[in-house]
Amino acid sequence: MSKIRLDQYLCQNGLVQSRERAKALIMSGIVFVNEQKVDKAGEMIAPDAKVEVRGHDIGYVSRGGLKLEKAMQVFPMRPDGKVCMDIGASTGGFTDCMLQNGAVKVYAVDVGYGQLAWSLRTDERVINMERTSIRNVNPEDLSEPVAFFSVDVSFISLKHIFPVADAITTPDAVGVCLVKPQFEAGREKVGKKGVVRDPATHREVLQMAEGYAMANHFTPAGLDFSPIKGPEGNIEYLMYVQHCEEPQPLPEGLIEKVVAASHETLDKAPNLH
């Protein structure tokens, strides 16, 4: 018998409703084939393999939704009734989470093409801005300013994101930004496979991100670590920001506290990629 893709198997056997959901489940690390965890959607398996989904469906088209879910649990931010933007949308986990929590419109921005889940691509509340660099987005490109936004981008520093966010958001907008040490630290501080493990570098990167926010009229009002590691096991951070005229820094000692907690919690956690 010829082998089939794992995500295809999940769909054909009624374990999920869509390939996007299948991919999300597989990447979340809860799909097992013949008692072995498999985290690649394209893994080829035998049709008679024993496939199990252990634990719970993550509830979003991708794991990104879990990051925003945590942000809404720990920070006073809600997308209910707001025009939102998902910067670095990819498959659309953040977009999905925003819609499930009452967003009236979401601009899904990504330089890539064809990545946004079909369920979101066909949702009239979603404005699909694929093949679009956030650095090139102007207020004129939007029918109204954004009141709630998220940032989850790769290979670009937040230094280039905050000036755009300043220009396209409402005076009282709020947002959550993924701070990724591997894309903020100097090249000499990034280890093998693009991994940054040194807590000192994490603290330095968070101080830089704090400065980028404040330089563009955003108060970094909260900080926590992402519940999910990035590719290759990088610890990433959630920074909650509020648009304002007179930005204030994070509370004294918070960066040190969060970095310490992130390493204590995630250093031994498995990678889900």
Segments from the language model and where they lie:
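Glycine-rich SAM-binding Motif I of class I
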Residues: 92-93, 114
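Flexible, glycine-/basic-rich loop-and-beta segments that form/coincide
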Residues: 235-273
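Conserved class I S-adenosyl-L-methionine
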Residues: 80-90
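A short glycine-rich, Lys/Arg-flanked "PGG" loop and its adjoining helix->strand segment in the class I
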Residues: 159-176
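A basic, amphipathic helix-loop patch mediating RNA/tRNA/ribosome contacts
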Residues: 1-49, 83-84
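Short, glycine-/aromatic-enriched active-site segment of Class I SAM-dependent methyltransferases
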Residues: 181-198
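S-adenosyl-L-methionine
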Residues: 107-160
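Conserved S-adenosyl-L-methionine
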Residues: 97-105
